[in-house]
UniProtKB/Swiss-Prot annotation:
Cofactor(s) demanded: a divalent metal cation
Family affiliation: Belongs to the Maf family. YceF subfamily.
GO molecular function, one term: nucleoside triphosphate diphosphatase activity
The species this protein was found in: Salmonella paratyphi A (strain ATCC 9150 / SARB42)
Record-given protein name: 7-methyl-GTP pyrophosphatase
Site feature: Important for substrate specificity: 12, 70, 154
EC number: 3.6.1.-
Enzyme class: hydrolase
Lineage, highest ranks first: Bacteria, Pseudomonadati, Pseudomonadota, Gammaproteobacteria, Enterobacterales
Subcellular location: Cytoplasm
């Protein structure tokens, strides 16, 4: 049976995959994540997830390789990682009272057979109306500078929301486990009896 590789260095994706109790290794994919001109959010995350998984095929020739990529969209615009506190406050002010959609692309590539499975999972985050003081307090307490959308739903960020809508809450953190389990079963790797 092929071994499992997570094409990511994200500690959040690693922690999510550990929930399945299947042994795996992590490896950093070498992929240019620059969007193509006019590329739609769904197309972008699908292309990048697939590229991440396939980029490791030569290094891991008899493996199941998981690639994942996520973007955040608000008012039709891709919202990246803020990197500064000021940008985080701006992103949260814009999200206040609005719906932010996350698109997570998932790819599972069997490097032995060349079989590729892909999926894009949307997830909507309904923000409640936030005061400037709440935004300042949140950014100061959680420091979400390396998180798309400027929040961590697995932490204090949950206090920013009115409600969440999506098939799998793990999608919001970066790895849609329900879809991944379906893909793994198609490759004869059932997490329940692995």
């Amino acid at each position: 049976m092929p071994r499992l590789i997570l094409a990511s260095t994200s500690p959040w994706r690693r922690a999510l995959l550990e929930k399945l109790t299947i042994p795996f290794e992590c490896a950093a994919p070498d992929v240019d994540e620059t969007p193509m001109p006019g590329e739609a959010p769904r197309q972008l995350v699908l292309r990048l997830a697939q590229a991440k998984a396939q980029s490791l095929a030569a290094r891991f020739p008899n493996h199941l390789i998981i690639g994942s990529d996520q973007i955040c969209v608000l008012d039709g615009e891709i919202t990246g990682k803020p990197l500064t506190e000021e940008k985080a406050r701006q992103q949260l002010a814009k999200a206040s009272g609005n719906i932010v959609t996350f698109y997570t692309g998932l790819a599972l590539y069997n490097s032995a057979s060349g079989h590729l499975q892909t999926e894009v999972e949307p997830f909507d985050v309904h923000f409640r109306h936030l005061s400037e003081a709440e935004i300042d307090d949140y950014v100061r307490k959680e420091h979400p500078l390396h998180c798309a959308g400027s929040f961590k739903s697995e932490g204090l960020g949950i206090a920013l929301f009115e409600r969440l809508e999506g098939r799998d809450p793990n999608t919001l953190i970066g790895l849609p486990l329900i879809a991944l389990c379906q893909m793994l079963r198609r490759e004869e790797m059932n997490p329940l009896n692995a």
